[in-house]
Amino acid sequence: MIHYPLYLVPFDFSEISNNALKLSLELAHVNNGSVFLMNVVKVKPDRSKAQMQLKKVIDDLSPADQKLITKRVLIGNIYEEIGKASEILRPSLVVMGTHGASGIQKIFGSHVEKIISNSATPLLITRGDKHMDKVKTIVMPFSFQKESIQITSFAANMAKKFGACIHLVGNHDNNELHEDGIATNQLVVERFMNENNIDFKMVDLPQEKDFYSELLDYAGSVHAEVIAATYSNGTKLVTNPHMQRIIENIYRIPVLTVNAEELV
């Protein structure tokens, strides 16, 4: 039975997508939500086999997990079906497993931009076997660009549900014009956190290495469970080198992201 918050999981029977399923179930248990597990086949004759495989996946889960899952095997184009499901179901999160940004591109091809860039649904990307039954620390980078703080409400919502602290990390680049934008964004985010009673702290990195190296090392040092970072159509998820670095972080920290332009 579908109830919200709802976690949409595209599933291809790989170990990677199985990890995404486990993570989504943990989120559903903590937040009294449910999981929509979907597999897409290209032609109708493949549907019966996929349905049996999907049934076996669910049968191997605990009764408590099984109660939270609604499953569907759809026929069509995987990119289009994920988009349709997101539009109809309005999930709180799309939870996807990947080897990394290049892994997403390999699995979904260039059409991943159609799935993600045209949706205001936040995406949780996970690598490896991670757990989210407890989230204590969320690291959120931001810059002088207003789009960089569009992830704030989603990160704050997760922090409130888990009682987590958000570590806000400004990207300082010694450009005076940029510093003004960073200061403005910091004030906006701080006000939002205070008004919504979200625990947070400001973090100043040493600026001894490039920002993203220091950001990821910091996230690893504080044992962050989630990195929350936004993107826009101007810096697409699968091609932006900074987002690739965040997704491919050596600590395998799940990444919460959303298309800022679709939120306007």
Predicted regions mapped to residue ranges:
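Intrinsically disordered or low-complexity boundary/linker segments at protein termini
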Residues: 1-15, 19, 117-151, 248-264
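Residues at the starts of beta-strands that form the adenosine-phosphate
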Residues: 6, 32-36, 68, 136-137, ...
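A structural alpha-helix within SAM-dependent methyltransferase catalytic domains
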Residues: 21, 25-29, 83, 152, ...
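Acidic, proline/glycine-rich short linear motifs
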Residues: 22, 26-60, 168-194
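Rossmann-fold cofactor-recognition segment
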Residues: 68-71, 202
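Charged docking surfaces used in two-component/phosphorelay signaling
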Residues: 73-81, 207-212
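Gly/Ser-rich helix-loop-strand patches that form or flank binding pockets
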Residues: 84-131, 220-264
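An alpha-beta-alpha
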Residues: 149-181
